[in-house]
């Protein structure tokens, strides 16, 4: 009987000592993560949109300058000037937003837009005008779709408001680009 009590006492002591030892081996529970957040609290999807918008705005400014300089038609030159002005303004607003959220915007074009700029820079006259108009239609269709999606689904209310405010300008750019594209398609090609 004495052996039974000793065994029982040992078992109780072991049972009481075991939980702290097991707990010490388990990793501490992680605090609830804010998945997709950065230090400024911006959701990953919103952050991606901001970066893409910044690259797009920079590209529109650079390509607009190129169009204002190289464009053969007045329509292309004027559209290029508008792109420089409107997208320069939009990028300034986006920069202010990014600073408030602790984001650093890119300082230069991404590879895709550099390649586009370099390709267009090699063209002249009507060839440049048509290629530029085609790119502006393609880019603004994508921009309008992206801004509509962000105006409805952005997690950040300030970003949602900015996307909503900017969307009508982009829709107008798309309409103007389509008109310019149609005008250039109907213009006679120069003799080769």
Set out the residue ranges of the language-model regions.
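His/Met- and acidic-residue-enriched segments that coordinate or traffic transition-metal cofactors
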Residues: 2-192
